[in-house]
């Protein structure tokens, strides 16, 4: 026995779940993903999403509607006669006609311990807030934003120096395992659903470019969380004088350090920077248009002597 599944996802994060469902023997009757976007060096080439590319390799039918406003798109979805839709980082809000368009509904893989961090950026927000753990949850979708009842949970610890990129990869694999388990239970009519708690609701707003600059007047722990929560994308940044002019430099990794001084000033020549309290050591950086490099390589080409002001 197997389920007839419509899979809906777009980025790399979604791919292991799609593969896991195929490997489990389910029938993927359609794959929905975001339409190809301009890309390439000049932005002239249309690039298919990671899910689109993998689905084609697997010989699965792919659909790329811009939205589901047209009745013909909604009817096409229903006409697949799917048992269930599995949604992982699809990127479109689903109307009621889609949520109710399969026999058993839509199940979403969400990267947080709901109701904490509902919304668009749960991985980044968990790290930026200094959370010690997060996880993947499979929930049955309803009209509200990530408000549906939870079926299964897999917790993942957040190490003190873990970046959003590293956590993304851990959750990506945990989510694939969890969704495979959830679909097996759903097929066996043994998938429990638990209503989310009303307490502890937090929303993970999309990262705004205006909040990515590093503010060294904050405590060192906050600065460290900010850096790792935005690494590798979009990247926390600071401004420093390079060749007599101010330039942006992304900071991709850091660690807590001891030391005191004026916030934003270098305490040594190894990129230990004073914060509002204590200090952070910048360990991986990237100049505009350049490749990421270690702090040692960075200061070898761009010395940052003690007392240098950064920000």
From Swiss-Prot:
SUPFAM superfamilies: FMT C-terminal domain-like (SSF50486), Formyltransferase (SSF53328)
Alphabetized Pfam families for the sequence: Formyl_trans_C, Formyl_trans_N
Described function: Attaches a formyl group to the free amino group of methionyl-tRNA(fMet). The formyl group appears to play a dual role in the initiator identity of N-formylmethionyl-tRNA by promoting its recognition by IF2 and preventing the misappropriation of this tRNA by the elongation apparatus.
InterPro entries given in the database record: Fmt, Formyl_trans_C, Formyl_transf_N, Formyl_transf_N_sf, Formyl_transferase-like_C_sf, GART_AS, Met-tRNA-FMT_C, Met-tRNA-FMT_N
HAMAP family recorded: Formyl_trans
Broad enzyme group: transferase
Keyword Manganese: no
GO cellular component, one term: cytosol
Binding positions ((6S)-5,6,7,8-tetrahydrofolate): 112-115
Record has Protein biosynthesis as a keyword: yes
Entry keyword set: Protein biosynthesis, Transferase
Cysteine disulfide partners in this protein: none
UniProt-recorded name of the protein: Methionyl-tRNA formyltransferase
MF GO annotations: methionyl-tRNA formyltransferase activity
Similarity comment text for this entry: Belongs to the Fmt family.
EC annotation from Swiss-Prot or TrEMBL: 2.1.2.9
Catalytic activity: L-methionyl-tRNA(fMet) + (6R)-10-formyltetrahydrofolate = N-formyl-L-methionyl-tRNA(fMet) + (6S)-5,6,7,8-tetrahydrofolate + H(+)
Species this chain originates from: Agrobacterium fabrum (strain C58 / ATCC 33970)
PROSITE patterns membership: GART
